[in-house]
């Protein structure tokens, strides 16, 4: 299964998804975070498609979408509903669309439901945990606050060991001035409790290491909204993963590369410039 949650607030739109796949016939899918797949596919700056359920059906749907001459919302909805129905409704879809207004379309149970506020698909237990983490922490209707609480609640679901079908990486697609794009961010999980007092100006961040159980990742996005892709660099381990669904549905690995080298190799191999924040010695540098 998986969990995908979409939300619209005052013209903004975001869709959060995990990357875990849980095919019981593939042992590695249960054991490795890197065996996951990108669950939210940005087709162009106006449309993204997310899925939950049967992976094979979802991959077939993505293949068929890329055969379309033009990504029009009517054709995208019709194609996904047809594939959903033909495969016994085993795979649900969530479409984020920027039309005259931001809209979320949910394809499930042989029908399409549209909302201008909220939709979700996937694991009901995961969604219930999301709601449990979201509502008690919602203190205002400020869009930035709502987005932060939403993101933190989704992180809690991924981190929980009670939801077996949800896990892996937390991928976000959101609205920017250029349309729907992947969110670039830095994630740092300390192996032990650390207290940091930051002074004004430049600060050195104690990254820790593998021995202390620290896990860090730098999420980088394509700078071209018409070539949507997302890369994740792991400073502790010096490797990167690229998700570029138009070219390859699976994760693309780059070993023994620092953040700069990872970005350079992606540009050389696929003509994509990925941007975001990377570790540069003891500092963070935007590329």
Indicate residue ranges for each PLM-predicted region.
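N-terminal nucleophile
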Residues: 1-287
């Amino acid at each position: 299964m998986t969990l995908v949650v979409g939300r619209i607030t005052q013209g903004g739109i975001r869709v959060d998804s995990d990357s875990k796949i849980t095919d019981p016939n593939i042992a590695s899918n249960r054991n490795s975070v890197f065996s996951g797949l990108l669950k939210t596919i940005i087709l162009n700056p106006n449309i993204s498609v997310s899925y939950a359920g049967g992976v094979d059906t979802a991959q077939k749907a993505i293949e068929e979408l890329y055969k379309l001459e033009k990504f029009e919302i009517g054709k995208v909805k019709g194609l996904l509903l047809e594939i959903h129905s033909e495969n016994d409704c085993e795979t649900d879809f969530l479409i984020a669309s920027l039309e005259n207004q931001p809209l979320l379309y949910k394809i499930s149970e042989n029908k399409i439901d549209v909302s201008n506020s909220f939709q979700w698909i996937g694991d009901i237990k995961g969604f219930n945990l999301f709601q449990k983490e979201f509502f008690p922490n919602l203190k205002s209707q400020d869009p930035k606050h709502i987005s932060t609480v939403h993101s933190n609640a989704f992180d809690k679901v991924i981190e929980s060991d009670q939801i077996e079908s949800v896990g892996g990486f937390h991928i976000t697609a959101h609205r920017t001035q250029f349309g729907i794009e992947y969110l670039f961010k830095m994630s740092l999980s300390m192996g032990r409790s650390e207290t940091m007092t930051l002074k004004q100006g430049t600060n050195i961040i104690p990254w820790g290491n593998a021995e202390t159980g620290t896990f860090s990742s730098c999420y980088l996005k394509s700078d071209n909204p018409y070539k949507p892709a997302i890369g994740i660099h792991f400073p502790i381990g010096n490797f990167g993963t690229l998700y570029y669904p138009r070219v390859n549905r699976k994760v693309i690995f780059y070993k023994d590369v620092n953040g700069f080298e990872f970005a350079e190799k992606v540009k050389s191999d696929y003509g994509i410039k990925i941007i975001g924040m990377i570790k540069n010695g003891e500092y963070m540098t935007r590329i």
